């Protein structure tokens, strides 16, 4: 069995709160496609693998992304320059950046973190989350 990496060797992450401004609503699967295509257009395949955008949570119109710390500027610029999805105008606004999901939810999205914490605790009791 493989050992886990010590914290000093793990990849550092940042969490980005964003808002999608558009005439239509998008489901979570489409938001993943929007973000991936924005990063692919601006950075290419190699840049997308380095940025490593991962959608943590999305509720229309705002969401949370997890990103590699070193390539945060590439993500910011690629999301700002993305202006069209499926021939519809779209604008992605970055609300804020933090190093924890809890701070993103409370400071930028103004949502209490407690309901999410309770769900995680229930899953831990059922041994579904480690």
Swiss-Prot record:
Does Nuclease appear among the keywords?
yes
tRNA processing found in the keyword field = yes
EC number of this enzyme: 3.1.26.5
Q: Which Pfam families match?
A: RNase_P_Rpp14
- Where is it predominantly found? cytoplasm
Gene3D superfamilies registered for this protein in UniProt:
Ribonuclease P, Pop5 subunit (3.30.70.3250)
Q: What keywords are assigned to this protein? A: Cytoplasm, Endonuclease, Hydrolase, Nuclease, tRNA processing
One GO BP on record is: tRNA 5'-leader removal
User: Which Gene Ontology CC terms are recorded?
Assistant: cytoplasm; ribonuclease P complex
Q: What protein name is recorded for this chain?
A: Ribonuclease P protein component 2
